[in-house]
From Swiss-Prot:
The modification Phosphoserine is found at S204. Residues 213-543 form the Kinesin motor domain. GO terms for biological process: cell division; metaphase chromosome alignment; microtubule depolymerization; microtubule-based movement; regulation of chromosome segregation. Highest level in lung. High level in ovary, moderate levels in heart, kidney, placenta, skeletal muscle and spleen (at protein level). Pancreas and spleen express a shorter isoform (at protein level). The gene is KIF2B. Keywords: ATP-binding, Cell cycle, Cell division, Centromere, Chromosome, Coiled coil, Cytoplasm, Cytoskeleton, Kinetochore, Microtubule, Mitosis, Motor protein, Nucleotide-binding, Phosphoprotein. This is Kinesin-like protein KIF2B. ATP binds at G303, Q304, T305, G306, S307, G308, K309, T310. Plus end-directed microtubule-dependent motor required for spindle assembly and chromosome movement. Has microtubule depolymerization activity. Plays a role in chromosome congression. The lineage of its organism: Eukaryota, Metazoa, Chordata, Craniata, Vertebrata. Osteosarcoma cells (U2OS) lacking KIF2B show disorganised often monopolar mitotic spindles, severely reduced velocity of chromosome movement and blocked cytokinesis. Bipolar mitotic spindles can be restored by simultaneous depletion of KIF2B, KIFC1 and NUMA1.
Amino acid sequence: MASQFCLPESPCLSPLKPLKPHFGDIQEGIYVAIQRSDKRIHLAVVTEINRENYWVTVEWVEKAVKKGKKIDLETILLLNPALDSAEHPMPPPPLSPLALAPSSAIRDQRTATKWVAMIPQKNQTASGDSLDVRVPSKPCLMKQKKSPCLWEIQKLQEQREKRRRLQQEIRARRALDVNTRNPNYEIMHMIEEYRRHLDSSKISVLEPPQEHRICVCVRKRPLNQRETTLKDLDIITVPSDNVVMVHESKQKVDLTRYLQNQTFCFDHAFDDKASNELVYQFTAQPLVESIFRKGMATCFAYGQTGSGKTYTMGGDFSGTAQDCSKGIYALVAQDVFLLLRNSTYEKLDLKVYGTFFEIYGGKVYDLLNWKKKLQVLEDGNQQIQVVGLQEKEVCCVEEVLNLVEIGNSCRTSRQTPVNAHSSRSHAVFQIILKSGRIMHGKFSLVDLAGNERGADTTKASRKRQLEGAEINKSLLALKECILALGQNKPHTPFRASKLTLVLRDSFIGQNSSTCMIATISPGMTSCENTLNTLRYANRVKKLNVDVRPYHRGHYPIGHEAPRMLKSHIGNSEMSLQRDEFIKIPYVQSEEQKEIEEVETLPTLLGKDTTISGKGSSQWLENIQERAGGVHHDIDFCIARSLSILEQKIDALTEIQKKLKLLLADLHVKSKVE
């Protein structure tokens, strides 16, 4: 669009003074065409010219409001090419007609100083009554240059982006330098490469998920401040919601380091970003409703000291204080009181009681009664009773948390090299539902003490070593009870420890259900403890992520026969098979008598073979029975094994003598012939 204005020359005004050539014919008081931010073009009066910064101030009246703005010189000349001086000619762009200015603009120009177009048009009159002012159209606007202010802004932005790129490069170089200075940089690089190429879709469980009386879950905690300071590596990967992988560092004979990736599969696996609410949703929450149906539920946290057991069960720590409102204790209590108000269970008229006690050094102490020593006895109905244990009635979640805080303040704890506030006892918090004085259901929440290796306590005091031994003994007994529960064995060795004895009603009975939360540390320095925890949990669940077929052997889950015994059993059974004696290739003769003599040998030895086979079977059963117990007698096992070996050696020696005599007779007969 273009606009043409005919502005009569005012006789009362003095002639315009020429400006400097680079400003062209722009003067104060003349009308120029300007472009608004909404792309509208109209006239405005020049009120000020800044020759130092090369900008012009213009004003106009719009809807009875006086407005103004600053415009750079180049923009003014692009919109008003007629104002450019002859000394600085500009090629005129293609023009198009614009709409005429409004009448208000024409009235305003009567009081303003007139301006004259420097390029006369062909239709200009001789008397100079009117002048044609052409405003360039869109092509001129497309070539519009940026103002100095915009140039400065763009320049600052480019400098800012350049600085940011340099800072990112510096940070990347620093991170690379830190990694290369790490003594385990090579292992860290191999772990990252393995995770980068890991395809979690190919990891699957051999056995389909089924409903079990026991649920085994694993939770990984993040690296703590101590491990980060020591530049420890995260060697635990959770590629899916039920698989945990451990990247163990190994070293070859030529000192070359490599990774041994071990895979474990469980019901659920949680990474270091999982919250307590998420863990509770898949572990303890499905068991809450069972206690309203006269069930006995147990949820316990197992793992190395400092792996996050107390954090999972109790909640967040702030120094030595613990926020119990975010742990499994509080979450279970919330659901219990929520179900208690449910119309289905409200008519049962149940009351909620809470108990809290610890098991330390094989003895039971009441944490709600100033650590009073308690006795564990069995009544006439063969029910285990903790004599003297206080049961306090609770009516809301706050009262439950109050009991937990009181008990945690009295619980036995010590400082260890791994954890400054390590629990040295098994804490058992029980939520009991009663109908009158009769127990309706019970939920036992167990925070186990951290298991320890003997190699980690060589420099510890004798008292602490005894603590660790007692802890490991009770954990072993707990594993055996869980194995018996998971395999539906007729006998559960709950008497092996005070821990399992107290939790007996949770291990026996048709309504018992158990959940295990194995907590692991991700650091490379805790690799051995992490593997022990995962193996413990894997023996409880016994699920493999393997391409090998699932095999059920003669030995119980988690137990294997010694290599020497297995090789001996295999060799003896193979050598005593009847078919092996029949297939002797070199015992041949044309005489029927010799053939019959050779063929009668297995018959003569059949009884010995049968006896030996029965002895092997009995031996295996004895070994299995002894290994299945918690307190098995090693001396007795060795003596029993030696006795069976002597019997087998005698039988094999007799067979050897008969074979040698037969071979000698065959050689003599062949020489005679």
